[in-house]
Amino acid sequence: MDEGFHYYHIFIDGAMFNDPGTENFYGSTRQESGIEIPAHDQAFYEERDVPHGNVQEVRFWSKSTNKLRRAFVYTPPTYNKDTKKKYPVLYLQHGWGENEYAWTVQGHANLIMDNLIAEGKIEPFIIVMTYGMTNEGFRPGGGAGAARPAGGARPAAGAAPAGGARPAGPAPAGAPAGGARPAGGAQAARPAGGMGMMLNNGFETVLCDELVPYIDANFRTIAKKESRAMAGLSMGGMETHSITLARPELFGSYGLLSGGTYNADELAGREKPKLIFMSCGSKENPDGVNKAGVDLRAAGYNAVSYVSEGTAHEFLTWRRSLYQMAQLLFKK
């Protein structure tokens, strides 16, 4: 098998089952079996004997959805040592069919950060991860208080179906050819209204008008756009594209991980972001990502294109992308 994290299931007499011998992960809006194939470059996301940060669950009231919502907040190892120090913040979004567990469970975002900080490759910053949709009638992983599955398996963001209907229209540059595909994995039925609800302004309101103020009020953040970034994988990248264009006063750096590209025309007439990071796997649509970077740099933008060699629409692509992007964010 290819390196990295993969979902799978077993068919017995035509029926699909999870493997009872492995841990389940949340993907395709349901629990899936998952397997980790060692990668030649896995040291950057391994658990190592270095100082570790903290991932805590927070609940914030959302007036727009009339409910208590959940987010996970990564704070670096230094956060509780110097109680006067303030930090930049990255808002990091999952893909379709996933939930707010995705980036720390499958993505190992906290371990990537811990290792980068220990090696002195980045200045520490906070990461905030929340559920990226407002379709509360069909919420992957259940509501904010959903129980974890039996046997200790953690509900984790997973991949949306590789099969099934895709959203109409051409694939964004950097997304798989043939249409913008949900974060890739095993086949499952798509819920009504799932992908079609992803780019509504409901989540924009939750993120920009409710979660960002909550984080700034309850954590030691540098509460200005130059110290605030938004990025996401697959659908989360598409949300990032939409929200950063709609709310340029909030975010100073943008990251699209297998989630399309920006172009100079749509960015014209506004202050240039500090960083535009665009990535995908070499088995996706790398030509579009590379061209977008060239075009944006020619137009005067600080744009970086990254292609993960030998990977597709999968978590090894996104782990590598976060590793690369984190080293470019919030540079003085």
Predicted features and spans:
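Non-catalytic cap/lid and distal C-terminal segments of serine-dependent acyl enzymes
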Residues: M1-K332
